[in-house]
Structures are given as C-alpha cells and as structure tokens.
C-alpha cells in the first residue's frame, strides 16, 4: 500500500491540508478526519478486532471492526470499502451512517494522541474474512449485546473510540437495529 496521509481539519472541521499518517500521530496530533465501521455478518453478529501489536497507537486492544483515514479527495464510504478490503479482505454492503458527528481526543499509554472527527458507520460483510495480520492480530464474531456488556465491564480492554461510541444511546440503538436487520 502506498504511503497514507490524513486530511487535516480546521476549527470548522473543513479540510485544511494533509500530513503523512505516521507523522500526524504524535504527542501533539493535529485534528484530522477518520472513520469507524462496525461490521456485521448475515446472522447479525458484530466483528470485533484486536489491533496488531505493531500498531503505533493502542496496540493489542480490542476495537470495532475497522478504522482508518480517508485520503485527500476520497469519500469516506470509499475509504471504508478500501480499508475493509485491506485489513479484513472482506467485501461489504449496506454501508449506513450510525454516528455521523462523532469526534474525540484520546491519549494512549505511550502518549500518542488521537484527535479525530470520526464518523461512525455500520456495514454487512458479504464475503469470507481474509485478515491482514499486520493490522489485526485476532478477531471474533460476537453478539452485539455481549460486546456492549464487555465494554461496560472492562472498558480498558477496548479502544477509547469504541468505548465512547458504545456509550452513546442513539448509536447503541442504531447499531442494535442494524444488527437485527432493521
């Protein structure tokens, strides 16, 4: 894969430039655009993934199915499809906004800062997973309610963005409806 960049955002969340992805994620990360996707199978189970130990931020933690950054000029939906293929080797359908105005700032144990405007989507997997082990060290299809209980009981085991997304009542309701095929 070619060198990835992040789209930097100004105070009004408008694109203001780009920066190489690894240069952007530091102790002083500028605000940038990202996305999160919660991927479900035909049985309504959620794919939770464990971030590779080689990840710069939050290595080894469990998180939602796929996250990433759109490239300059790339629609978020196109970026989600690209990252699902790259990280999980999977095709998706029914891409649906769940929490379009989610944003957060979090600091990982190594001091790396995430500072993102990060729309959240749900989608359905339409093919068998072929996981890229450089991105994902483990994954599991789980019942959404079980995952939400796990997040509540042990939030430290999950990415902060997943915990924050799961704590939003409206997002939880929309994810549950999506899982149930509504």
UniProtKB/Swiss-Prot annotation:
Binds 1 Mg(2+) ion per subunit. The magnesium ion binds only when substrate is bound. Binds 1 Mn(2+) ion per subunit. InterPro entries: Idi_bact (IPR056375), IsopentenylPP_isomerase_typ1 (IPR011876), NUDIX_hydrolase-like_dom_sf (IPR015797), NUDIX_hydrolase_dom (IPR000086). Pathway: Isoprenoid biosynthesis; dimethylallyl diphosphate biosynthesis; dimethylallyl diphosphate from isopentenyl diphosphate: step 1/1. Mg(2+) binds at residue 87. The keyword Transcription regulation does not apply. Gene3D superfamilies: Nucleoside Triphosphate Pyrophosphohydrolase. It comes from the Bacteria. Residues 30-164 form the Nudix hydrolase domain. Homodimer. Belongs to the IPP isomerase type 1 family. This is Isopentenyl-diphosphate Delta-isomerase. It comes from Salmonella arizonae (strain ATCC BAA-731 / CDC346-86 / RSK2980).
């Amino acid at each position: 894969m070619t060198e990835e960049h992040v789209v930097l955002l100004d105070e009004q969340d408008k694109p203001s430039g780009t920066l190489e992805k690894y240069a952007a994620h530091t102790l002083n990360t500028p605000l940038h655009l990202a996305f999160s996707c919660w991927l479900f199978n035909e049985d309504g189970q959620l794919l939770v993934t464990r971030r590779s130990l080689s990840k710069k931020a939050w290595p080894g933690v469990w998180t939602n199915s796929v996250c990433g950054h759109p490239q300059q000029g790339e629609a978020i939906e196109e970026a989600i499809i690209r990252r699902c293929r790259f990280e999980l080797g999977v095709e998706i359908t029914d891409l649906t906004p769940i929490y379009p105005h989610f944003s957060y700032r979090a600091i990982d144990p190594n001091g790396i800062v995430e500072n993102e405007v990060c729309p959240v989507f749900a989608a359905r997997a339409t093919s068998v997973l072929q996981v890229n082990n450089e991105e994902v060290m483990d994954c599991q299809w789980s019942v959404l309610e079980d995952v939400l209980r796990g997040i509540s009981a042990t939030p430290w085991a999950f990415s902060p963005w997943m915990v924050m997304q799961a704590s939003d009542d409206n997002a939880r309701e929309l994810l549950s409806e999506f899982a149930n095929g509504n």
